[in-house]
A protein has these predicted regions:
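Short loop/turn elements that form and flank the Walker-type P-loop nucleotide-binding site
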Residues: 6-8, 87-89, 220-221
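A short, flexible beta-alpha/helix-coil linker loop
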Residues: 19-20, 97-100, 231-235
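Intrinsically disordered, glycine/charged-rich C-terminal tails and inter-domain linkers
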Residues: 1, 124, 131-212
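An acidic helix/loop motif centered on a single conserved Asp/Glu
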Residues: 210-237
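Catalytic beta-strand-to-alpha-helix segment of the class III nucleotidyl cyclase homology domain
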Residues: 3, 40, 62-158, 165
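Structural motif
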Residues: 10-12, 89-91, 159, 225
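Catalytic NTP-binding/metal-coordinating core of nucleotidyl cyclase/transferase enzymes
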Residues: 2-77, 81
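Short, solvent-exposed loop/turn segments at secondary-structure boundaries
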Residues: 24-27, 104-107, 237
Length: 237
């Protein structure tokens, strides 16, 4: 690490607007207006929570806080405001880890982990890592639900993901829901293949019975000989 770079333990937050890509493709002015509205509404909340509004990444936000509890409380307030704002449907991820400060940016493995957790948040919800969950378990104000330990792209360590389900936040479990969808598809494929095999067997059985029936009927007939009269047209002697 460069001598001019400083590291710090922080609570890292990533946010993302659900459906923003589709909105941008259909109505770019409306998409830009939504980003401006997000900034106007949420930046004062982050500052009131003593958080750092580091940067905007497209429709997403990168924020940091001094503690996990501060980050969680602030994100709950953010979701309350977003819920009452048309089009501002957010997914939020929170993780705690060591970050390297670079001017108005941060880097580090834990920043990458936070960005990977974000997609496991429910729309309108907050997903957190096991480190953040550990800071909440002794506080009865918060309730969380374990989602699983998915393989996060570019992350070698195991990360357990939880969803905050108190404070009116949704309890959707995207990891389990995905597994259910895959299981249903697998069962449907098995049933389809089994049905196809049984259909083929049935057709072959029917053909076989038909051939046997024809063979039996033919064997019961008495063979006959057709005698054709022969006319001799040669010279008679």
């Amino acid at each position: 690490m460069d001598n001019n770079q400083k590291s710090k333990l922080s609570a890292i937050v990533f946010t993302d607007i659900v459906g923003f890509t589709e909105l941008s493709a259909k109505n770019e002015p409306a998409a830009l207006e939504l980003i401006n509205k997000q900034r106007d509404l949420l930046k004062p909340i982050v500052e009131d929570c003593e958080g750092v509004w580091l940067k905007e990444i497209g429709d997403g936000l990168l924020l940091t806080f001094n503690s996990s509890v501060e980050a969680v409380n602030c994100c709950i307030e953010i979701q309350k405001v977003a819920k009452n704002t048309k089009g501002l449907n957010l997914r939020i991820a929170i993780h705690q880890g060591e970050v390297i400060l670079q001017a108005d940016d941060i880097i580090g493995d834990d920043v990458n982990i936070t960005s990977r957790i974000e997609k496991y948040a429910a729309a309108g919800g907050i997903a957190i890592s096991d480190r953040v969950n550990a800071a909440l378990v002794r506080n009865p104000e918060f309730s969380t639900q374990y989602l699983g330990s998915p393989n996060l792209k570019g992350v070698s360590q195991e990360v357990k993901i939880y969803s905050i389900i108190s404070h009116g936040l949704p309890s959707l479990d995207p990891i389990m829901e995905s597994a259910t969808v895959n299981k249903q598809k697998m069962n449907w494929n098995i049933f389809s293949i089994t049905g196809a095999v049984l259909s083929v067997v049935g057709i072959l059985f029917w053909i076989n019975i038909s051939l046997l029936s024809k063979g039996t009927a033919s064997s019961n007939k008495i063979p006959s000989v057709v005698i054709i009269p022969f006319e001799n047209k040669g010279d008679s002697k």
